[in-house]
């Protein structure tokens, strides 16, 4: 599951289209506030029933009341720092069942710090790390230079 926050600028749609273009062997679903509730239910049931599926969804549509046990990886693609939102997002993948022992959370951070000063993306990232520590989640930090 790939979660995004900015629904107004087409950010999630671009992620969805990029994955669909590169993943012809996978079913890829897109859910935002404009997605019909019946369609949302169909997509979440399909996620639950199969493997090798990808859901790109806005935080707002997946934050509460959704239960999909068959989520093994969650990608957080935008910077935010709300502890409630973070816990709700991580909770999407924490529903265990026979054969599932963990969920991988991939938390993307763009470092636009300048002249030794953290920008808000890095500040939010540091706050999320503190939440991960407080909740005793195992985590690793990887720096990828591009």
Regions found by a protein language model. Name each.
Residues 24-27, 69-73, 98-105, 135-137:
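Short glycine-/polar-rich loops that comprise or flank the Walker A/P-loop
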Residues 33-36, 78-83:
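Short, acidic/turn-prone active-site loops that include or flank metal/cofactor-
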Residues 10-63:
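Conserved helicase ATPase core of P-loop NTP-dependent helicases/translocases
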Residues 7-10, 61-63, 79-82, 94-95, ...:
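Conserved nucleotide-binding/hydrolysis micro-motifs of P-loop NTPases
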Residues 129, 134-146:
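Charged phosphate-binding loop/patch that engages nucleotide di/tri-phosphates or the phosphate backbone
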Residues 56-57, 64-79, 87-88, 102-107:
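A short beta-strand element within the Helicase C-terminal
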Residues 92-128:
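Conserved segment of the helicase C-terminal RecA-like domain
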Residues 1-7, 31-32:
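Conserved RecA-like ASCE P-loop NTPase motor core of nucleic-acid helicases/translocases
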């Amino acid at each position: 599951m790939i979660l995004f926050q900015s629904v107004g600028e087409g950010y999630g749609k671009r992620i969805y289209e990029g994955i669909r273009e590169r993943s012809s062997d996978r079913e890829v679903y897109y859910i935002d506030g404009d997605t019909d509730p019946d369609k949302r239910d169909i997509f979440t049931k399909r996620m639950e029933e199969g493997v090798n599926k990808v859901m790109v969804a806005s935080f707002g549509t997946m934050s509460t009341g959704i239960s999909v046990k068959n989520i093994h990886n969650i990608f957080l693609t935008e910077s935010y720092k709300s502890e409630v939102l973070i816990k709700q997002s991580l909770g999407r993948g924490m529903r265990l069942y026979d054969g599932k022992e963990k969920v991988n959370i991939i938390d993307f951070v763009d470092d636009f710090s300048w002249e030794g000063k953290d920008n808000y993306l890095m500040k939010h990232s540091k706050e999320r790390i503190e939440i991960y520590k407080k909740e005793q989640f195992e985590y690793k930090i990887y720096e990828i230079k591009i």
